Amino acid sequence: KENKKNLGYGGNIKKCLNFSLKKKFDYAVMIHGDGQYDPKHIPSLVKEISGDNTIGACTGSRLLDGTKGATKGGMPYYKLLGNILLTSIFNFLLKTKYTDAHTGLWGYNLYNLKNRKFNFLTNGYNFDNEFRFMNILKKTLIKEIPIKARYGDERSQLHIKYAITFFINTILFFLIDKKIIKINKFK
């Protein structure tokens, strides 16, 4: 069902998660609508999060098996380098080991969301980044499975703005993690 008002990227995910919780589903899946991610990976995502409530989510990683999952599908090299750089900064500052922090394929274990304040997270494109950080603070795992993605000729205008926001948020998360600053929305 189409939204009457544009809720933003994060707003749409929150709507999906709230709907799924209200219906008492066990899992929810988010897949970008740009056709880059193959829905055939959905059963693998759900398999990874089912039956283990220490796992908050599972993502499809284009880089878990090196760069083949990204480059074979036609990922532009500037996107690949940006993804690797931003994910590496996130991992270094927050002591994590993600391979693809910018994926458009997520499976959510709803058991872990029942008492989480995810509705306070951004409605924008950095929802995934904030969600990932919230799980780090709660000591809930986010697993990754290897996937391949397909890229067309589409162009996006948000790359630089997204990258800057992601970088600033990662510094902010580091400061919160080190208890230098406190922001309640991540509790």
Task: Specify the residue positions occupied by each region the protein language model found.
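Acidic, glycine-rich active-site loops and adjacent beta-strand->loop/helix elements
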Residues: 33-36, 151
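An aromatic- and histidine-rich active-site surface loop
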Residues: 35, 44, 129-130
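Hydrophobic residues at beta-strand termini and immediately following loops
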Residues: 1-3, 145
